[in-house]
Amino acid sequence: MSNKEKATKISWLTLAFMAFSTVWGFGNITNGFVYFNGPQVIFSWIFMFALYFIPYALMVGELGSAFKNEGGGVSSWLHQTTNAKLAYYAGWTYWACHITYIASKGSGFLKALSWAVFRNAETYDSFPTRYIQLATFCILLLGCYIASLGLNPLKKLLTAAGTCTFVMSLLYILMMFAAPAITPTAEYVHANLSFSSLIPNFNVTYFTSLSILVFAVGGCEKISPYVNKVENPSKGFPRGMITLAVMVVACAILGTLAMSRMFDPAVINASAESFNAYVANSSYWAFQKLGQYYHVGDLFMIIYALCNVISQLAVLILSIDAPLRMLLDNEHTKQFIPQALHKVNAHGVHSNGIKMVAVLSGSIILAQSFVPGAAAVLRQLTKLNSVCMPMRYLWVFAAYIALRNAYDTIPAEYRFVKNQAVAKFFGGWCFAVTAVCCVLGMYDKDPFTFALNVITPVVLTVLGFILPALAKREQTAAKK
């Protein structure tokens, strides 16, 4: 290897940090803590990482190594291993999953803005839901308008705000552990951390919440293009992924322990209203309390909220634009999409595609106008995203199984495991875990939330089948 080639290679440790900032976030800690009865989530985190995340990450490494020249991600992998039709469905799923994600970004923006301005949870929650949802819908339309201009003016701001939020998440853990020594007279929760107290109650609520953890640890396929840029990929990549897993496990456990000194699970689960409030506000309360421990008032919370304001708006715009381009710009799958959706405006943007995003995401936003309470809306969106977003991971595991079926014809510099049976078992295992968690996650005691969790993925799936039929009808008519 020449000196120039060595200079362009990245170390396994650099890869681990790149992947960590992509996969992990402070919201994963707070959601796990709230949904899994505080410190009891530690048990679930450990098993989720050992039996799901590590094999998932290593399978992605093998896929990235085998298709190092393919830039289309999962859709390209399936096109190479199966056929164009399945590649289309993978691309469609990736785009469709973002419909619910886009619907949640406007609410996240308003919540962050409210905390930055009013510095409390009560003001936002006191507004009538229909007004909040109307404002959220207007933010969606604003995001669609900016995306239709072909501009990504907030991309650099997103990077800066995302980095700031990421750094603050790590600082939170360090500063929270140091707080008792600095401010010993402050009020801290004394959590029971005995082994027996950490074993969760395996009931319906537990199993229907597992999709939250699957959603939290997913997304590492985004780093697959870097597999062959790592020094000695066959050894460097798995080392980087194992390091990533250790970092994420450590962050999840230490973050949970830090939060257990602040929040009492009994208070969180005291009522449905209390639970909804913690789902919507726990991250802001965490930084607000941290500021009180260090005698700086609401400073940490305001910084976190302002970073979130920028991030939520920027992610909204990028989530409208990027998945749509991945779906409609793929030459291999254009034949399955009606020509009307390929319409490009003067800025090179698929204008009709953006209109479809506005209609579908807007429908979810407006449907939630009838939900009693803004905090309940955010809880619904958190659960809905945990049901829909992991569905795109199913195609990763399908692509991996297809790759192993073509073991002799598609070479890869890095292999997760050499044994075919073991490799296919893990591919099938991760596929099954994802599918089961998504289906179980649909259940909710609230009938409206349950209906939303079922109807949304069903409608998006049906629409994914309808488009190829419309495209085929167009092509048949054009031949006559």
Tell where the protein language model's regions lie, with residue ranges.
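Loop-to-transmembrane helix boundary motifs in multi-pass membrane proteins
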Residues: 7-13, 133-134, 231-233, 243-248, ...
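Hydrophobic transmembrane alpha-helices that form the core helical bundles
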Residues: 55-62, 66, 70-136, 145, ...
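Helix-loop-helix junctions that connect adjacent transmembrane segments
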Residues: 5-8, 43, 123, 127-130, ...
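Membrane-interface loop-to-helix entry segments
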Residues: 133-188, 218, 241-246, 382-395, ...
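Membrane-interface "cap" regions at the ends of multi-pass membrane proteins
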Residues: 1-43, 47, 52-61, 69, ...
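TM-loop-TM module centered on a large, flexible mid-protein loop between adjacent transmembrane helices
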Residues: 76-77, 240-316, 336-380, 385
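C-terminal membrane-solvent junction of multi-pass transporters and transport-like membrane proteins
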Residues: 5-7, 343-347, 390-444
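Membrane-helix boundary/coupling elements in multi-pass transport proteins
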Residues: 93-109, 222-226, 295-338, 391-400, ...
